[in-house]
Amino acid sequence: TPGAELRVESDDGPSLVTVVADHSGNAHVAFVPAEHKVISSTEEWADVLSTGQILAPGVYSVVDESTGSTHGPVRVLSVEDLPDPSLYRQELEEGFGYLEVRDGVTLSIMVRFPNEDLYGPAPWPTVIEYSGYGPSNPDAPQPGSLLANLLGFAVVGVNMRGTGCSGGVFDVFSPAQAADGYDVVETVARQPWVLDNKVGMVGLSYPGISQLYVAATRPPSLAAITPLSVIDDLWRQQWPGGTYNSGFTRAWLAQRDAETKVGGMAWDQARIDAGDEQAAANQAIRSQNMDFERFGRAIDNFRPTLDARRVETVVDRIDVPVYLTGAWPLRFTATQSIA
């Protein structure tokens, strides 16, 4: 219900936070303040993590304070909470489509097969490009996808939750994005057109960084990754030496905020205008996307709760071959590569 005050309680009773549903009746909770408070807009989340915590996996209840009714139990999944294997039996066809992940969110995907006249019939070696840019844009393949396709690979471009035509709330480099990547790898690998039912990942910068988070979840069907031009710590990229990076990082986050709004990318709005009902439905919760540029500015001191988003803390879990390159462009102000 629009304007409803929804109180989140942990399984053992304490009230954690109350959120006010937006004009569409949507609400989203990913963080918990140090003390219970009412959050009436997504802009207020920016100040929560500076003193609060990430909402931990577990069982919760939601109480509608206007009616007293309780909804739940609501289970918050962890990356390790794997779905029933039947989820990975989805059939993916050439062209634009959607792939469902473990919490029911659908991600927009673009499947491109190689030229059969040059490379023969399926199955083909297959790679995934996964980011919040436009990897599932049917009319503009990303560089990694384009090159791989020309070299004889089947390519699957996947937009992260909350971006492009995908559903869900955008939360940069969150555990949910890593878990989604696991589900994407396992679903794609089971397609009959995938050689040896193994896939790799490609991409530079954003889709390069995302590979490291996904590989750290150890999807059994992942063969190798090729992360190019990556960073090691998003917070230190935004606060190098304790000084706010008002250059590239500020602009990059501001662009992510703009592009993840409803119809924020021209191509996703074009699909909606052309009658893509799934794309339109997936935009409904975009009002819950946070302002990440403001969010990052609010965290002017490093918090241990940010460790889950530090590439440096997850890469030791990767157990597949890695081809990694680094970069030192002028737009970056901190060491970018992982030692």
Stretch-by-stretch model annotation:
Residues 318, 324-326:
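Short beta-strand/loop motif that positions the catalytic acidic residue
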Residues 117-124, 129-167, 331-334:
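Short substrate-entry loop that stabilizes the transition state in hydrolases
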Residues 21-33:
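Glycine-centered loop-to-beta-strand initiation motif
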Residues 78-122:
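N-terminal cap/lid segment of alpha/beta-hydrolase-fold proteins
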Residues 8, 39-68:
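Short, aromatic- and glycine-rich surface loops/edge beta-strands on solvent-exposed regions
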Residues 142, 213-317:
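Accessory cap/linker subdomain of secreted extracellular hydrolases
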Residues 115-123, 169-177, 183-205:
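Gly/Ser-rich "nucleophile elbow"/oxyanion-hole loop immediately N-terminal to the catalytic nucleophile
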Residues 203-213:
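Glycine-rich nucleophile elbow surrounding the catalytic serine of serine-hydrolase chemistry
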